[in-house]
Swiss-Prot record:
GO terms for molecular function: guanine phosphoribosyltransferase activity; hypoxanthine phosphoribosyltransferase activity. Gene3D superfamilies: 3.40.50.2020. Homodimer. Signal peptide: none annotated. This is Hypoxanthine/guanine phosphoribosyltransferase. Disulfide bonds: none annotated. It is an enzyme of class 2 (transferase). It is found in: Cytoplasm. It catalyses: IMP + diphosphate = hypoxanthine + 5-phospho-alpha-D-ribose 1-diphosphate; GMP + diphosphate = guanine + 5-phospho-alpha-D-ribose 1-diphosphate. One of its GO terms (biological process) is purine ribonucleoside salvage. Its EC number is 2.4.2.8. The gene is hpt.
């Protein structure tokens, strides 16, 4: 299962930014090429593993959650909303301070309301900073977080998110960078 995803990740080049080993893949970066069958494999696995019947909205994070949310939305018919990097100043907009292993920035939530049953999807959980910020903001809005899904898990970020937010983070595959190459540690689906 998830053979295309695993193969794509294992072929990903690795670059080093400071002390952070960053792998470049179609799932996490949209380059070199994101093939439709890769996205379908991912959303098929999500649809099989999770009961999505009561989900009101899919919530993704700009930028690399957008293609995943789009594919999942088309497959399931569930609408999606993007947590953006740009402030729009719309009524009810919630600002999030995001601190990751490679920088700090603000994100903005629009279109998520109290009581919305949501699925949060993102490409990767690595340091956990983005998901911690997003989950805490969604809880502040009083959204009902049904699932948090990161396609790829790298490092200890998933455990950190779960510890700091009390919210389970589901992943499809766990990887590590060993000797400059991406290695599959396990897959959870």
């Amino acid at each position: 299962m998830l053979e295309k995803l695993k193969s794509t990740l294992e072929k990903s080049p690795v670059i080093k930014k400071g002390e952070y080993h960053y792998f470049v893949s179609p799932v996490t970066d949209g380059i070199p090429l994101t093939e439709p069958n890769l996205l379908m494999e991912i959303v098929d696995a999500i649809e099989k593993k999770f009961d999505l019947e009561d989900i009101d909205k899919i919530v993704c994070i700009e930028a690399m959650g957008i293609h995943l949310a789009t594919a999942l939305s088309i497959k399931t018919g569930i609408p999606f909303v993007v947590i953006r990097k740009k402030k729009y100043g719309l009524p009810g907009e919630v600002e999030i301070r995001q601190v990751t292993g490679y920088g700090e920035s603000n994100l903005y939530v629009n279109g998520v309301n109290s009581g919305d049953k949501i699925l949060v999807i993102d490409d990767v959980v690595s340091t956990g900073g983005t998901l911690i910020s997003v989950i805490n903001a969604l809880k502040k809005i009083s959204a009902d977080i049904k699932y948090v899904i990161a396609v790829v898990e790298k490092g200890e970020g998933r455990k950190k998110v779960e510890k700091e937010t009390g919210t389970k983070v589901n992943t499809l595959v766990k990887v590590d960078v060993i000797d400059g190459e991406v290695k599959i540690i396990n897959n959870e689906v």
